[in-house]
């Protein structure tokens, strides 16, 4: 499949994805939000701790 055929097929693929996808309910959305925020906070804390350790080493 060449590039032009793939580009022509994109709207059809997007339409299929949108028809299959469904909007999450409030509980599912809040769970995803909490998990995302916890992971972001963890990664930020980890990055800060690494930066702090490296600042004292160097």
UniProtKB/Swiss-Prot annotation:
Gene3D superfamilies per record = Preprotein translocase SecE subunit (1.20.5.820)
How does this protein lie in the membrane? Single-pass membrane protein
GO MF annotation terms = protein transmembrane transporter activity
Where does the record place it? Answer: Cell membrane
Family membership: Belongs to the SecE/SEC61-gamma family.
**Complex and partners:** Component of the Sec protein translocase complex. Heterotrimer consisting of SecY (alpha), SecG (beta) and SecE (gamma) subunits. The heterotrimers can form oligomers, although 1 heterotrimer is thought to be able to translocate proteins. Interacts with the ribosome. May interact with SecDF, and other proteins may be involved.
Query: What is the protein name given in its UniProt record?
Result: Protein translocase subunit SecE
Organism listed in the record = Acidianus ambivalens (Desulfurolobus ambivalens)
